[in-house]
Amino acid sequence: MKNLIDFGILNLSSIAPMMVLSLFAVFILVLNFINKNISRTFWTMLAILGLAINIFFLFGYSGIVRGFFDLVLIDGFAFISMIIILLFSILFLPLTLSKENFHDCSLAEFYALYLFMIVGYEFMVSSQNLIVILVGLETSSLALYTLIALHNRTRAIEAAIKYFTMGALSTGFFCFAIVIFYLSSASLDISAISYSAKNTDSILIATACIFLICSIGFKLSLIPFHTWIPDVYEGSSEVMAGYISIVPKIAGFIVAMRVFESLYDSNIAFIQISLYIIAVLTMTLANIMALIQNDVKRMLAFSSISHAGFVLCAVVIGTKSANIGLFLYWLMFSFANLGAFSVLWFTRNKQNIWHERFDHPFEKFNGLVKFLPYTSFLMALFMISLAGIPPFSVFWGKMYLMGSAISSGFIFMAVIMAINSAIAVYYYLRIIVCMFLKEPLENAEATLYKQNSSNAIKFIITFSAILCILAPFMVKFWTDFVLKFI
């Protein structure tokens, strides 16, 4: 009997990276069922191995790869974003090997969910079909909510519930957008929707775009959709808070680039204008809120929101140069933010000994240089990098984006970016002042800052610092690498 399905047409190699990670995740669960006494070091190394093999499969592709009747698309955007997703997913894993044995990091389920979450992000960035993007979005989101809740304290449960609520709203808006797009264009493929928008003056597509902007706004923590995001960061472990600030957002930006940039030439002029306004509001208001925070983790939460506003400017501009700038900016920001959250994790205590609510009040870092000089200097480096002070990492991303804005005629946008960069310097320098110019608290001693230290965390902090310093030498290599694929 003739086969009904031609597996050659499906091109299973197009989902090889997702299949590899799914198999590793299932293997972790089965192995844990057989033996409950396996250490977290083994789980960490196994997860890193799965991610490394995933990267190997990615570099095995040559050119654009399509599969499953064009539902899966591995193009330049997908390839570059998956490299970033996998790279930082690998770099966050050693942070689980902390000195303190936190509940979530010792569970095999944590590592399985971690891999399933990454599978979701890979599907999000490797498709132009809105249903596949939705499946990836939900797969990653449900795993992420659980990972936050596994931290096993009241505020972590609260953070997970708040994030779940925001995610549910995002999914609802996304589903509304999908339904309306299908009604207007009879397709869920982004290119077909774009074609329909260019050839019809449909109020339906405009309405769908409004819902989609709201949905992606929640996922990227853009103002006014950011709502509970600072509370989510505060309640999450430093590992997951740092991860939330980097990996989910690059997946969201790729979806935004695919959808919105394809619609700029249509009859729907308000899309670009709306994103422009949201980008300016996100940069500015998040910066202002960061100025008044009393906790370093919450400050970094608003800082991450502001940086998302900067990167959204690349989507607004919509040129090839701006798209390259997006990848450059996010890579440079990610190294600095990884380092900053790693330092917070390094100095984390299980008990709230510094403040009745916060784990990392600014006062905690008073005089830190006297106890941890090496860590203090590296934290200062990360703050200077995030502030965009030359010649460190984020400076190059900001310069590239500002150059793209000016060359494309977005002069006002470039001015707003420059003003917000100046505002951000204050709250980044604030922690440097605490570490180097203020006297330590009376109960402060070196052992209190080292209770969660480990060689793995020290390695990630040092590695991030080296990359922030070497940023000037990485810019041309990275931009040339990205240019080959987009």
Swiss-Prot record:
Keywords: Cell inner membrane, Cell membrane, Membrane, NAD, Quinone, Translocase, Transmembrane, Transmembrane helix, Transport, Ubiquinone. Pfam families: Proton_antipo_M. It is a multi-pass membrane protein. One of its GO terms (biological process) is ATP synthesis coupled electron transport. It comes from the Bacteria. The chain crosses the membrane at residues 14-34, 45-65, 77-97, 105-125, 130-150, 163-183, 203-223, 237-257, 268-288, 299-319, 326-346, 377-397, 409-429, 459-479. It is found in: Cell inner membrane. It catalyses: a quinone + NADH + 5 H(+)(in) = a quinol + NAD(+) + 4 H(+)(out). NDH-1 shuttles electrons from NADH, via FMN and iron-sulfur (Fe-S) centers, to quinones in the respiratory chain. The immediate electron acceptor for the enzyme in this species is believed to be ubiquinone. Couples the redox reaction to proton translocation (for every two electrons transferred, four hydrogen ions are translocated across the cytoplasmic membrane), and thus conserves the redox energy in a proton gradient. PANTHER family: NADH DEHYDROGENASE. HAMAP family: NDH1_NuoN_1 (MF_00445). Belongs to the complex I subunit 2 family. This is NADH-quinone oxidoreductase subunit N. It comes from Campylobacter hominis (strain ATCC BAA-381 / DSM 21671 / CCUG 45161 / LMG 19568 / NCTC 13146 / CH001A). The lineage of its organism: Bacteria, Pseudomonadati, Campylobacterota, Epsilonproteobacteria, Campylobacterales.
